[in-house]
From Swiss-Prot:
Biotech exploitation of the protein: This protein may find application in fermentative methods that use microorganisms overexpressing rimK for mass production of poly-alpha-amino acids, which is thought to be the most economical and ecofriendly manufacturing process.
GO terms (BP aspect): protein modification process; SOS response; translation
Gene: rimK
Species in which this protein is naturally found: Escherichia coli (strain K12)
GO cellular component: cytoplasm
Known cofactor(s): Mg(2+); Mn(2+)
The protein's name in its UniProt record: Ribosomal protein bS6--L-glutamate ligase
Amino acid sequence: MKIAILSRDGTLYSCKRLREAAIQRGHLVEILDPLSCYMNINPAASSIHYKGRKLPHFDAVIPRIGTAITFYGTAALRQFEMLGSYPLNESVAIARARDKLRSMQLLARQGIDLPVTGIAHSPDDTSDLIDMVGGAPLVVKLVEGTQGIGVVLAETRQAAESVIDAFRGLNAHILVQEYIKEAQGCDIRCLVVGDEVVAAIERRAKEGDFRSNLHRGGAASVASITPQEREIAIKAARTMALDVAGVDILRANRGPLVMEVNASPGLEGIEKTTGIDIAGKMIRWIERHATTEYCLKTGG
């Protein structure tokens, strides 16, 4: 097969591993910067051009689209889809997952347990918003934040009011969430490919922090997950219509709670921690699903 990887930086670990895994299995691979793709949208002859040339047909496309370029990145991916390329995560699913509010609404509607959460733009009554999620301590986040950026633990009511008021001054959407103390700064990252959790790690926050993101200096170890955690991770990915997802779970006294569903999970931390060839599993999923029937359905 001919496979395109959409990424702004082909030197990143995840891109290199996906390219390596695809080549090892006999496929041709090209890494394309989605921002350098430009599209001819024409009912008679749509096409995608890249750095002065018209791109050939790709059997499959692997999107590694960063949050900052979600709009144009998903538009480029959508053009590949319309030309009959199989996407490892469809553009609409990526856009849905990047919308934290919509994601939580969809997960809640499917009965997937979440931390008690309130979302507001400019709350007229900060005190009522705090009460709505059970009071302090609580976590205040910017809805648009990623990798632990724009996330604050407010341990007292006064601190919570101050943080919310400060975020409100940024004209930003605010997410207020109960703090799961018993998780002790740890979460579980489950890597889902299709209908299987192929790997799981426990991520621990660095000392003095509560954010377990590896980008923020957290540490990781292999996690043994329960059947309930496995089931909720698969259900969360399926709810978001993602074939590949990183599902972050907190272990609360009342059971596992889904924190986030990531549409473009990094492979470095979880592959190096577990020793599992996740990139290879992703390529094998593509081999099973990038069929002629898919291309005909999408118009390729």
